[in-house]
């Protein structure tokens, strides 16, 4: 039996209706098979740069920048022997021959997509097994393939896994995961939020609605892990996931379509308020001179509508600029304006607005520091909104036309080449909506 009475209509990224009257819980990370698969996939997927390993050994440049060890060069044809190396690594990584291990070569053997078997995570406290097991397997496979001596084996390890464990992170490694190392988490339950915006944008090939969807899935699934989306707050987070990230009732799409040509942040707010009135989400509580004060009997639904409006405003504003840099200002002033327009709480009850103040400063004010694409939901500046800010940043970076120093191409090239090959990472909206439609009668 469903916990909540809410039902939504689900659409694709072109605004076409896919399924009507889907129970809200069909989009829950606890129920939706596609979301479960995406989360598990992100935990167990590793990108391996075989060409990078070969070049690191050939030049003896290992362990990060300014680290070249003269006389330790190894000229190994790793790319040319990629098939043999990958097969040997797979044999070490897998638990049984018929498990869900996947080792797939890409780009003519220059890259490898590795998916560590689920059985390894059944006996793991967290997700470090993916990079560490993968790295160890490829190190051994390369050593065995080329009969590397015991005196040169440490160079192979350094070329694959970098300076670790002398460094906390895998500095200079030629492997990559979307999840950062556990030591960098701001607190318990933050792992799925600790994924750079640019990684999400790269994996979805800069498709704006898909990037927003994947970011929302990660952020809102983290709320279940952190204990935020429990009890009285579960419905609020599910509605946010549905409307802001999954384009429920085509709300985001409709707002962008209506405002895309000549609209502004303000016109998106005006349309959003009108839509909320039509749908009975809000009502006029008090009429003053030239001003209306609105009220609602359903704050969670109002928050979802406001969050969808914020996503649309970001797409309209940053899309018009073809630049992501102003996303922090959109996050700030959309919420400031909607509070004044309605008298109702802004998105995430003020937490997005508060986040945007610091985000503006640290992304391009006096301090600078880094562009929007290098932030994540675990970052000390942007962690404060519980799942409603970072998806908008992902949408903004997807719309950026190359204005950023820290672009997805610059920071996330290996992620793009490898993770975008996984259909559910590249088109999460499609697969989550289809899965919700399949299980709707089971809720």
From Swiss-Prot:
How is the activity of this protein regulated?
A: Methyl-coenzyme M reductase activity is inhibited by 3-nitrooxypropanol (3-NOP) in vitro and in vivo, by oxidation of its active site Ni(I), which stops both growth and methanogenesis. Is also inhibited by the reaction product CoM-S-S-CoB.
Kindly state the subunit structure of this protein: MCR is a hexamer of two alpha, two beta, and two gamma chains, forming a dimer of heterotrimers.
What is the predominant subcellular site recorded for this chain? cytoplasm
Q: Which cofactor does it need?
A: coenzyme F430
Recorded catalytic reaction(s): these are: coenzyme B + methyl-coenzyme M = methane + coenzyme M-coenzyme B heterodisulfide
One Gene Ontology term, aspect cellular component: cytoplasm
Q: What is this protein called?
A: Methyl-coenzyme M reductase I subunit beta
Q: Extra info from the record?
A: The MCR reaction has been shown to follow an ordered bi-bi ternary complex mechanism, in which methyl-SCoM must enter the MCR active site prior to CoB for a productive catalysis.
Relate the protein's function as given in its record.
Component of the methyl-coenzyme M reductase (MCR) I that catalyzes the reductive cleavage of methyl-coenzyme M (CoM-S-CH3 or 2-(methylthio)ethanesulfonate) using coenzyme B (CoB or 7-mercaptoheptanoylthreonine phosphate) as reductant which results in the production of methane and the mixed heterodisulfide of CoB and CoM (CoM-S-S-CoB). This is the final step in methanogenesis. Neither N-6-mercaptohexanoylthreonine phosphate (H-S-HxoTP) nor N-8-mercaptooctanoylthreonine phosphate (H-SOcoTP) nor any other thiol compound such as CoA or CoM can substitute for CoB as the electron donor.
> Which branch of life, at top level?
Archaea
Q: Which GO terms describe its molecular function?
A: coenzyme-B sulfoethylthiotransferase activity
| GO biological process entries | methanogenesis
Primary gene name: mcrB
Give the EC number.
Answer: 2.8.4.1
What residues does coenzyme M bind to? 367
Regarding protein family, the annotation reads:
Belongs to the methyl-coenzyme M reductase beta subunit family.
């Amino acid at each position: 039996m469903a916990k909540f009475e809410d039902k939504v209509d689900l659409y694709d990224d072109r605004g076409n209706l896919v399924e009507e009257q889907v129970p809200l819980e069909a989009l829950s990370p606890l129920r939706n098979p596609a979301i479960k698969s995406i989360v598990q996939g992100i935990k167990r997927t590793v990108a391996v740069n075989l060409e990078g390993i070969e070049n690191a050994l050939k030049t003896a440049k290992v362990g990060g920048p300014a680290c070249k060890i003269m006389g330790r060069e190894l000229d190994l044809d790793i790319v040319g022997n990629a098939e043999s190396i990958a097969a040997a690594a797979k044999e070490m990584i897998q638990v049984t021959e018929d498990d869900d291990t996947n080792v797939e070569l890409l780009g003519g053997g220059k890259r490898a997509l590795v998916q560590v078997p689920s059985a390894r995570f059944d006996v793991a406290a967290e997700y470090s097994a993916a990079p560490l097991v993968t790295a160890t397997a490829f190190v051994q496979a390369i050593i065995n393939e080329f009969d590397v001596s015991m005196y040169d084996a440490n160079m192979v390890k350094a070329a694959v896994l970098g300076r670790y464990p002398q460094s906390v992170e895998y500095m200079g490694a030629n492997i990559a995961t979307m999840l950062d190392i556990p030591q960098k988490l701001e607190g318990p339950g933050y792992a799925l939020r600790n994924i750079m915006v640019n990684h999400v944008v790269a994996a979805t090939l800069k498709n704006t609605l898909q990037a927003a969807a994947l970011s929302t899935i990660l952020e809102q699934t983290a709320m279940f892990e952190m204990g935020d989306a429990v009890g009285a707050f579960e419905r609020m987070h599910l509605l946010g996931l549905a409307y802001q990230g999954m384009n429920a009732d085509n709300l985001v799409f409709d707002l962008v379509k209506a405002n895309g040509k000549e609209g502004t942040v303000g016109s998106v707010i005006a349309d959003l308020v009108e839509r909320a009135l039509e749908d009975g989400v809000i009502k006029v509580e008090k009429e003053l001179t030239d001003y209306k004060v609105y009220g609602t009997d359903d704050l969670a639904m109002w928050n979802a509508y406001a969050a969808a409006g914020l996503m649309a405003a970001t797409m309209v504003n940053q899309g018009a600029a073809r630049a992501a840099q102003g996303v922090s200002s959109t996050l700030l002033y959309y919420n400031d304006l909607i509070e004044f327009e309605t008298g109702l709480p802004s998105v995430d009850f003020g937490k997005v607005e508060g986040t945007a103040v610091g985000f503006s400063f640290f992304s391009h004010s006096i301090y600078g520091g880094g562009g929007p694409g290098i932030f994540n939901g675990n970052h000390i500046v942007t962690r404060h909104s519980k799942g409603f800010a970072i998806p908008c940043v992902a949408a903004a970076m997807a719309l950026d036309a190359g204005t950023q120093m820290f672009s997805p191409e610059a920071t996330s090239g290996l992620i793009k080449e490898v993770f975008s090959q996984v259909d559910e990472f590249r088109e999460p909206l499609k697969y989550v909506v289809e899965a919700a439609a399949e299980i709707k009668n089971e809720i």
